[in-house]
Amino acid sequence: MPGNSFGELFRITTFGESHGPMVGVVIDGVPAGLPIKKEDIEFELSFRRPGRQFVTGRREKDEPEIVSGVYNGRTTGAPITILVKNTDVISSLYEEIHYKPRPGHADLPYIMKYGFENWDYRGGGRASARETVGRVAASAIAKKLLMLTDTWIAGHLKSLGYVELNEPVTFEEVLCSKYSPVRASKKWLEKKYEELVKQATVEGDSWGGIAEIIVRNPPIGLGEPVFDKLKADLAKALLSIPAVMGFEYGLGFNAAKMKGSEANDEIVKKGDKYRWKFNNSGGILGGLSTGEDILVRCAFKPTSSIRKPQKTIDLRTGEETTISVIGRHDPAVAIRGVSVAEAMVSLVIVDHAMRAGYIPTVRISDDQIKIIEERWNKYISLCKPTQVSQ
């Protein structure tokens, strides 16, 4: 089963299954000298962690264990391996789906490709979103490296079901949405999202949503024409996330409804710099970053595992039957999906920053360490749960 690695210079390989002993990631290409603590990784994982209100009831501690590539609190330049144990597994809840593939899931395609006898049906196996733990763990290191360029990345849930945010939002509000149980950047929006999630839970159903990720202060010129354009790599990164159905940046699909005179980014002079007046392009033109904030969105479909009865096939008889999925599932996978989308954007940006020479590939100097630590501590402490806007 190839296809488990992502990135060029900053390269990750994830491993593990939903109900296996552990999941994890190997990170290649991290320069030596970067200060890394277990707490740095735990901070990012905490916003993806299950077992909280409005998400799956599976209670995983998600405590990372760094087993290689770090010595005396600093990276050595060798591959970094991070393990996260699966501690709250109830495989008996999945016995029915062994013979009844779930609608909307990868069950049947996996069976057809790899064979029924080779398919790990427990919790979705390798196709489970549990795999994304490794991506989020790696993003802590990516985000810390990006402190060198003072590049910050944050995401929020722009829409859930039919409720959508259609008013301006600041980067600080987006950053503080980490502490919202439904990743809302406004208090009024949080209440509406919570009502929808409660409704879906009662009905045994689910909702989809749209995650929006902002890259603040990205370096200019990230991206490599022609097939490694920044937008292309961002699209691949986000579309690789389980349940993601679509990707757009800047104006996105709305640009198709506009005239060129409306959609074009006018170039203006601000001080001694050339800037774009509206940033309609979402910080990317010609596949290269412009220096404006990068704005991307990805659409998550509703969680496929629902209690409502649906048609499927009983593989023992070959006949149609029904299935009601019993287990611990997110009523809206987009809520925790924001953290994963944020992580994937971080991995793309740090990889291209290294390729463009903005971040060293061999060793971090002592002066650079001071800059990284100062900015990272600011990132950790900047927002508090009470700062989610009204």
Curated annotation (Swiss-Prot):
Name of a matching Pfam family: Chorismate_synt
Name the Enzyme Commission number(s) assigned to this protein.
4.2.3.5
Task: Cite the binding residues for NADP(+).
Answer: R48
Which stretch is the leader sequence? none
**What are the UniProt keywords, alphabetically?**
Amino-acid biosynthesis, Aromatic amino acid biosynthesis, FAD, Flavoprotein, FMN, Lyase, NADP
Q: Which reaction(s) does the protein catalyse, per the Swiss-Prot or TrEMBL entry?
A: 5-O-(1-carboxyvinyl)-3-phosphoshikimate = chorismate + phosphate
* Cofactors, names only: FMNH2
Top EC class for this record: lyase
What cellular component terms from Gene Ontology apply here? cytosol
* InterPro entries recorded: Chorismate_synth, Chorismate_synth_AroC_sf, Chorismate_synthase_CS
State if Repressor is listed as a keyword.
Answer: no
Q: Which GO terms describe its molecular function?
A: chorismate synthase activity; FMN binding
Binding-site list for FMN: R126, A127, S128, G286, K301, P302, T303, S304, S305, R328
Which GO BP terms sit in this record?
amino acid biosynthetic process; aromatic amino acid family biosynthetic process; chorismate biosynthetic process
Keyword Phosphoprotein in the entry? The reply is no
UniProt remark on cofactor binding: Reduced FMN (FMNH(2)).
Protein's pathway: Metabolic intermediate biosynthesis; chorismate biosynthesis; chorismate from D-erythrose 4-phosphate and phosphoenolpyruvate: step 7/7
Q: Which family does it belong to?
A: Belongs to the chorismate synthase family.
Q: What does this protein do?
A: This reaction introduces a second double bond into the aromatic ring system.
Instruction: Kindly give the PANTHER family that the UniProt entry links to this protein.
Output: CHORISMATE SYNTHASE (PTHR21085:SF0)
Protein name (Swiss-Prot/TrEMBL): Chorismate synthase
